[in-house]
Amino acid sequence: MAMPTVFSTSSRMLALSRHSLLSPLLSVTSFRCFYRGDSPADSQKDLIEIPLPPWQERTDESIETKRARLLYESRKRGMLENCILLSLFAKEHLQHMTEKQLNLYDRLINEPSNDWDIYYWATEAKPAPEVFENEVMALLRDFAKNKNKEQRLRAPDLEYLFEKPR
C-alpha cells in the first residue's frame, strides 16, 4: 500500500513542477496586448529614412532602351500591388507611348521615394502632387479602375514581347 502513496506523491510533485514552470508564461502572455499598425501616440522616433539619390532624367538612351528599362522597372517594384498594376499597365500602354509620355512615366515611377505613394495616387486614395498630374497619370488612373473587370492576380508573362506585331 505504500506504493500508491509514493506514486501519487511523485505525480503531484510532477504536476506542481509543470504548473509552476508554465504559470509565469501563461500569466505574462495572457495580459499582453499586441497592436497592428501605428498607434496615435507613435512619435516615429525609431523610424529611419534612408535618403535616395535624386531622380535624374536619362537623356542619353534610345527610345527602345527606355521602353525596355521602363518595362523592367514596372515589373520589379518591391511591392506586389505595384508589380501587378504597373506591369499590366506597361504591357498595355508602353509600346504606344510617345517619347514625352515615356519621360513622364519614367518620372512617375522613379522619382517618388515611396512606392505606396504611386499606388495611392493611381487608385485615387490620395491626391497626387501637381508635378505628377499629367496625361500618363490619367491613363494609369483609368487603367487602375479596371473598367473591363479583368482578372489581375499577377504580372503578365513576358511571351507577348516575342509575338509578331499585328
From Swiss-Prot:
Organism: Pongo abelii (Sumatran orangutan)
Protein origin, superkingdom: Eukaryota
Keywords annotated in UniProt: Chaperone, Mitochondrion, Transit peptide
A single cellular component GO annotation: mitochondrial matrix
Origin organism lineage: Eukaryota, Metazoa, Chordata, Craniata, Vertebrata
GO biological process, one term: mitochondrial electron transport, succinate to ubiquinone
Transit peptide: 1-29
Listed Pfam families: Sdh5
Function: Plays an essential role in the assembly of succinate dehydrogenase (SDH), an enzyme complex (also referred to as respiratory complex II) that is a component of both the tricarboxylic acid (TCA) cycle and the mitochondrial electron transport chain, and which couples the oxidation of succinate to fumarate with the reduction of ubiquinone (coenzyme Q) to ubiquinol. Required for flavinylation (covalent attachment of FAD) of the flavoprotein subunit SDHA of the SDH catalytic dimer.
Family statement drawn from the similarity comment of this UniProt entry: Belongs to the SDHAF2 family.
Name under which the protein is recorded: Succinate dehydrogenase assembly factor 2, mitochondrial
Compartment annotation: Mitochondrion matrix
SUBUNIT field: Interacts with SDHA within the SDH catalytic dimer.
Disulfide bond sites: none
KW Lipoprotein (keyword) present: no
